[in-house]
Amino acid sequence: MLNDLPYLSAGEGPPLVVPLYTPQAANPRGLARWSTMRLVRPFTEHFTVYVVNRRPGLPPGTTMTDLAAVYAQAIRTTFEAPVNMLAISTGGSIALQLAADHPGLVDRLVLAGTACTLGPIGRRAQRAYIERARQGRRPSPALAEVVTESTIGRRLLEGLLWLSDSGHEDHTDAAVVLDAEDGFDLRGRLHDIKATTLLIQGDKDLVYPLELARQTVEGIPDAQLVVYPGRSHSGTFTDKRFAPDALAFLTDS
């Protein structure tokens, strides 16, 4: 445990902290673990990568500020700050909040598939996920809307996502995190971020639309934006250009 936070580590070199969001407040298992490690593997040639999840048992009403404070304390007690960070999707929201609230802890920050607040489709889908979780229903089908705009594709994906939920998992913690992100809006705080920042975004991202990504970069001093045409939310950080672009930024002296 990293200051009581579950984490996976791999590689050699200076630390690269990756705040992770998964439905369960634990190290990912099975396919989720494989896909997570596949994402960070290129970075292990240059860094010791720490994939860090949240602490289980989050109280209702937890905010992004609260989550960022937990990660900040873990960084302070574990590393010689500041550290480099790599963050995607909801993990990017946590990283942005951390970089604004604790600017001395982050040196270089690479973000992907994220922004300073949720877009309307992402917000609607996550609220539906939260409601289903609170009702004890399998929540993942609510996320089909953020994957495809096709009605037929959405219906098919809803079925697959329903099957992927075992029905035995507790999604309470996940709902608390997404509820925190629902209230997350950093547009008035972006100037507080001092980290050297790169945001990589697909122009077809339905969760965090490109316009919000542009606002994010415009608000952070000297931040850079790289746009992948035709790429969706998840397609951004699975694109073959992602690791080389991120590594070039992180290792640029």
What does each of the following model-derived ranges do?
Residues 1-59:
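Conserved HGGG/HGGXW glycine-rich cap/lid loop of the alpha/beta-hydrolase fold
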Residues 66-84:
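Conserved acidic catalytic loop of the alpha/beta-hydrolase fold
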Residues 87-91, 95:
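Gly/Ala-rich beta-loop-alpha elbow adjacent to hydrolase catalytic centers
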Residues 96, 100, 108-136, 173:
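Flexible "cap/lid" loop of the alpha/beta hydrolase fold
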Residues 120-122, 139-184, 189:
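Conserved alpha/beta-hydrolase catalytic His-Asp/Glu region
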Residues 193, 199-201, 205:
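Short beta-strand/loop motif that positions the catalytic acidic residue
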Residues 206-212:
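Conserved alpha/beta-hydrolase "acid-adjacent" motif
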Residues 223-253:
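Catalytic active-site module of serine/aspartate enzymes centered on a nucleophile-bearing elbow/loop
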